[in-house]
Amino acid sequence: MELSRSAAWSALVFHKHEVDKKTMRDMFAGDSDRFVKFSLSWKEMLLDYSKNRITSRTMELLLELAHSAGVDEKRQQMFQGAPINFTENRSVLHTALRRPPGYVLEVDGLNIGDEIAGVLFQMKNFCEKVISGKWKGYTGKSITDVVNIGIGGSDLGPYMVTEALKPFAHGGLDVHFVSNIDGTHIRETLKRLDPETTLFIIASKTFTTQETLTNAMSAREWFLARAVEEEYIKKHFAAVSTNQEKVVEFGIDDANMFRFWDWVGGRYSLWSSIGLSIALYLGFNRFEELLAGAHAMDEHFLNEPFNRNIPVILALLGIWYRNFFDAASHAVIPYDQYLHRFPAYLQQLDMESNGKRVDENGHTVTHATGPVIWGEPGTNAQHAFFQLLHQGPDLIPADFIVPLKSQNPSGEHHDMLLANCFAQTEALMKGKTEQEVRAELSDAGYDEADIQKLFQHKVFSGNRPTNTILVHELNPFMLGSLIAMYEHKVFVQGVIWRINSFDQWGVELGKQLARTILPEIQSAEAVTAHDASTNALINMARTFREENIRKESAQLSFF
């Protein structure tokens, strides 16, 4: 049966008409316990979901949907290592990466607990050598800078975490990230570094990823321009990969190759050896705290009943708006500058996971799936796109994330930040009525004619849903918990939508075509093999490239 024809779904369709008759402003006015009913506390985190277009009956029906969709069974399968990534026949065990040592879990005949412990031990020893200064470069100097070269999950997660946890860095190393194949990215990064004190981490599972290997070769050339001897590569390059042959061929000592596994998806890989740059920057003990925070959320997700389960509640609210209110996007607004890369990280996590149109049976879905995820830090966001949130025609649910403790207390700064965060969620919920606007304009001295012209522009409809996620402090443990919370939210939604949240075939077609187009751009012959638009674009690039080469040759011959 199609999801949209199920009893639980149909009940929600009918119930939505009842909810439409009420505003959140009225709901709060009629229930002094609304916050208590619709909030959850867990460790040093509070989820306030009372500013949503829901009633107790809404939550009952959404929870019924989750149970009828088999979320509990699928959750157990994931944690036990069943191949729930059914299009690639793989287990999904990023949760195993953050479990405390000493457990037994077999995948393909191997106890992955031992496998993970071995890689963590290797990472710890490596980090201790580099951080302590015992690891020396080719001239005998200690390492001062680490450059992580990767893309997608090999970049977004580590970059986000190192930015978010800057106050917890040990201070002995600077870390840099290169992902874009645009040569500007690596050139701008390298121009301020010293080859004698720089360590590169090449993060690529297959060691064949075009963008990563192109950047890695540029880094290698830059290094050898000063160091000359290829033997010195072993002192300045490490790899996170499964392809030992390619790693050694590059010149990296296989003792400095850190493995990970097929059951670790790229967007879930920061918990694995892909997190080596995190461990180097923060220190291995802080990396362990990050893992511990994620594991604590895993335990919460695995063991709490759905009505007290933060990831489940967030997932159900997302489905409520995506499927019953036609909300095509979801904003994430962290009121913490250190989390400025968090929305970008969640874009990949959510959109690569649930941006699917085919269900587990190979049929085109008849319901909406993953929304567009976007956002910026508050209060910058308020002066950029909050106009749309408040008065635009579309309903855009939003998550507000804010720590109560600032890592940089300075006068009233943090109090003002908190005030803005809380004010925005209240404003989105309450809005401002015509009566309130008219009274405000009248008090400001406007006459009736001017009020009549202006009042509609100053009315806020309100009834715009938000979640507020309060944490005591943004530290490694809590960041780990936040990331895992969103991972499990995405998982639950994928189960309900009956899609595979763990493959990403959508990234492949463009890469395949790029491999064909690259030699065509470099060819001397006009291209006609594509559609008219693509042919024209390639040929324009070809012509410009050829003319540029001729100009450069003419300038060289002149001198």
UniProtKB/Swiss-Prot annotation:
Keywords: Cytoplasm, Gluconeogenesis, Glycolysis, Isomerase
Catalysed reactions, semicolon-separated: alpha-D-glucose 6-phosphate = beta-D-fructose 6-phosphate
Subcellular location(s) of the protein: Cytoplasm
Active site (catalytic residues): E352 (proton donor), H383, K511
SUPFAM superfamilies, A to Z: SIS domain (SSF53697)
Pathway listed: Carbohydrate biosynthesis; gluconeogenesis; Carbohydrate degradation; glycolysis; D-glyceraldehyde 3-phosphate and glycerone phosphate from D-glucose: step 2/4
Coiled coil: none
CC per GO annotation: cytosol
Enzyme class: isomerase
GO MF annotations, alphabetized: carbohydrate derivative binding; glucose-6-phosphate isomerase activity; monosaccharide binding
Gene Ontology terms describing biological process: gluconeogenesis; glucose 6-phosphate metabolic process; glycolytic process
EC numbers: 5.3.1.9
Family that this chain belongs to: Belongs to the GPI family.
Biological role stated in the UniProt entry: Catalyzes the reversible isomerization of glucose-6-phosphate to fructose-6-phosphate.
Protein name as it appears in the record: Glucose-6-phosphate isomerase
Organism listed in the record: Chlorobium phaeobacteroides (strain DSM 266 / SMG 266 / 2430)
Taxonomic lineage: Bacteria, Pseudomonadati, Chlorobiota, Chlorobiia, Chlorobiales
